[in-house]
Each structure stands twice: as structure tokens, then as C-alpha cells.
């Protein structure tokens, strides 16, 4: 081996030992005739000193520049008093260099690594192989590896088998567009890249492999956001003969162990909350419990007022009127309120009413608001008592359809919590349970809230009689307002699966065409089964404090789903297209 140690492994216990390092020159300094090289590798940094008494190595050190690849032989020694660098793991020692071999030279990088400045993301992605040399980026990938190692070990120890499922499969309706792959040997037919291993892992349960896991690549052709990529990694888990409480307990323990091992963070038992409670209190099915603000329903106090903005939704069975108290924010400037009003409009809210509580003892006179005149004093007092308002608070109101109010005030709650730094803790894990089985579309049809293979908490007959009120056996793990993982008990009886398909408007011939293999499998002794899938990229993003999953993926795509480093996607030559039986239509020329 060319090296004896990584730079990040050096410490006082190695003092006096001769070691060999290989890495990149991070920084070169010439101080009073002595040359210092900071050598960097994936594990960290080490300072190497070259003395003019060793002419050959000193001359070689004088010639090297940043990002040269070098091999250094030297002896570990303690740094002189006053020269200890507390910012380096190896900052108490240095290496006295005996030999220096340049393994490769480097041109000047497109951006500096030793004095990292605000470089545009596209430049970083174009030269990702250089960007990943930065210590903070290397640390993220190291932590990602530790996370997957911890998870694999836990699942292996608990009897799970690591089984790979196909990447080339067929298109199934799972909510997003598929990436399609044309078949050369079957003209006119296409494979699809899997959006998840969902159906294959269920078939593994039918086959008797009762504890499965896989760290799986998944693909979705959808619009990108901060936490989305066209290809992403999933920690996929499926079990047989366990109920939802068993699966929740098993995976919660895995996450608790993971955080203890990797971040030395200890979690207690995760609280559970129903979907309905989460939406009413927090306006979200993935509430951030670090934030103490809550939504409070007040429609019963506003259903008789003459102000139609409130009374209309208050008397609408599908409407909602809710309040959000922000403690100590009565001094909020009108310009800030206007900004928040504009913000909630993104979610469909038509306005943002408010009451500033200056002095409650004075009654309506002590309240500052354009809406106070529309609300009887008795109702005002009930509302302020219900939300816990005291002098110095501001109370915001939303009134519209339930979905609009919940999403708008829920998003405002998060924004204000961040703006005013209201978080009460660093980590807040939880479970959300009792999700609706379906969501109703504007035309009265139904869509699966999770996916069509989720089991309901009722019989097929009850489900078809009352689909709008049916609850599913689904559960989501949420951390700091981010969905870490979602899962459910699956349908294991053919009759129930067909009932769900019918409610989703999937006719019998389409059921056979797209899911015939699954329906066939359910006839042959499918066991009760369920599972869960974690988004690995999101998990690593949260654990490293990164702002985007692009920061924790070695070679991510841009927000336009392109790889600027390899220039993918690219044009394919005509011969390859002919072999695939594809002919491209000419794009109409712009006028």
C-alpha cells in the first residue's frame, strides 16, 4: 500500500512514528525558510513541515502547488507550544517531512478549495469531482456511508434479507411520470424504471421471504424541488406476519439507534398523532413539533357575524375558520404583515386577517385590528381565551375551504417559527397515523392518498359504501417537519384489492393489464404483510444540516433534471434510434 495512515487518523499517540501519507496539497505556506504543506485526503487534513536541512524534499516542496497529488514520508511530532490548531483533528501534531514524491500535478482549479467562496451551484456541479474534495462535502459523504452501514447492520441483526429487485420493469400508476426505456428486441414496447420496489417486495412476501430490505434506486420524472431528484435512494423494508405497531416499533428503534451511533443524539419514544389532529393543530400531515405555534378552530364563534368573509366558511361543511397566535409579536410592522399576506396567497388564501392584542383589560379598545368591529365582544373574548392570547401577542386568522386554511396557516406557522426563531428543541421525531384511505377530487372521483396497495381499516363492503370516510392502515415517520418514511399494512386479499381498484376508477380489463401478476399472486396464499420506505437522501440531509439533497448525493442532477458534468441527457445518433425502432419528430420552428 502507498499510504500507512489517512491524514485524519493522525494524533498524539503516533508521536515519534514514521508514517506515509498520500493526498492533495490543500495549502502551501513558506514561513522563514520553512515550508508547510497542508495535505488533505477524504478523512481530514495534516500539516507537514519541510526543513531546508533536507535539501531534496525541501526543493520538491518548494515546487508543489495547490491540488498537486503527493506522497509524503515523515515522522509524527508534537507541534511547538502556541502552534496547536484546535480547528484540526490532528492540530496537536505535525509531520516532519523526509521524502516528498509528486504523483501528479494539477492545473489551477476553477474555484479555490482552501478559501472557499460563494461559487454558483452549476459550476460546482460541472466540476463535481473537485467540489467533492472540499472537507465539508467529503464529511457529508462519509456520514452517508456511516448511516447506511448502521441501517444495514440493524436490519441484518433483526433477520432481514437484502434482496435486489428489477430496475427494468413495466409502467404502473404510482402518482408520478415514469422514465421509459425502449426495448430493441420488442419493437414498440417500453420498460419503465421503478418509482419504488413496491410490487416486487410484496411479491417477495408472497414467496415467503418474510423480512426483506434493500437500499434501492428509484426514479420519478417529476418537477424538482429542494428535496426531490429524478433518481433517489430509498431504504426499502417489508415484513410478513407483523402488524403496524410491530413495524412502527421495529423501525423507530432503528432510527433511535442510528442517531445515537452517528450523531450521539438520544431520542425517547416517538409521539403518535392522527392525521386529523395533525391537520387541525398544525395544518400539515408532517408537523414540525419543534415549533410551539398551533392552529385553533374558531368557526363556532364567527358563524353568526355579518362579516361574510368569516361567516361564509364558518357555515360551510367543507370550510374552516382558524386562528394562529404568535406570542410577543404585536409590535410586528405592517410591512411584515403585508409580506405574510402575500405569502399565504401562494396557498390560495385570499387574505390574512389579524388582531394585535395591546391591552386586553380595555376590551375591544385594547385591540388593534380592522376586523374587531365585526365581532361581538363576547365572541372576541372567547376566541382570545381559546388561543391563549395575552398582551403583546398577535393573532392571525384564515377563513376559506378546509384545505386552503390548513395549508396556508400551516405554512405561515412554519415561516413565522423560522423567522422569529421559535424552535424549542433541535430534533422532534413523531409518527402520523390513521390517514384517510382516499382523497376526493373536484370531479367527485377518488385518488389513493398513499398508493393503491394500502390496506383500509374496514371490509371491502364498508369501503365501497363509504370511501370518503375510510381510514387506512398507513403510518408516516416525521422528523422536524420532513417526512422521513412512509409505510402501511398492505392488501393481501384479492377481493379487497379489486375493490380499491374499482373505487379508483380502474376497470377490470385495466386491472388485469397492469396488475394481473399481483392479483394472480394474491390468489396463492399471500400472507398479511406491510412495510415502510425511508428516503435516504432526505435522512442524510437532515442529519448533516444540508439545505438540499443535492448536497448529500455524490453526483446529483440540477433542478432541471440535467447532469451538467456529463452533459446528460444527450442526443443519440440515428443508428441507435433505428435499432430501437424510434423516429424523432422534427420540432416546429419558432416563428
UniProtKB/Swiss-Prot annotation:
Subcellular location field: Cytoplasm
| Gene3D superfamilies, A to Z | Bira Bifunctional Protein, Domain 2, GAD-like domain, Nucleic acid-binding proteins
Please provide, in alphabetical order, the Gene Ontology terms of the cellular component aspect for this entry: cytoplasm
Top EC group: ligase
Its EC number(s): 6.1.1.23
Q: Name one GO biological process term.
A: aspartyl-tRNA aminoacylation
What catalytic reaction does the record list? Answer: tRNA(Asx) + L-aspartate + ATP = L-aspartyl-tRNA(Asx) + AMP + diphosphate
> Which InterPro entries has this protein been placed in?
Aa-tRNA-synt_II, aa-tRNA-synth_II, aa-tRNA-synth_II/BPL/LPL, Asp-tRNA-ligase_1, Asp-tRNA-ligase_1_N, Asp/Asn-tRNA-synth_IIb, AspRS_core, GAD-like_sf
What keywords does the record list, in alphabetical order? Aminoacyl-tRNA synthetase, ATP-binding, Cytoplasm, Ligase, Nucleotide-binding, Protein biosynthesis
Function statement: Aspartyl-tRNA synthetase with relaxed tRNA specificity since it is able to aspartylate not only its cognate tRNA(Asp) but also tRNA(Asn). Reaction proceeds in two steps: L-aspartate is first activated by ATP to form Asp-AMP and then transferred to the acceptor end of tRNA(Asp/Asn).
Family note: Belongs to the class-II aminoacyl-tRNA synthetase family. Type 1 subfamily.
Q: What is this protein called?
A: Aspartate--tRNA(Asp/Asn) ligase
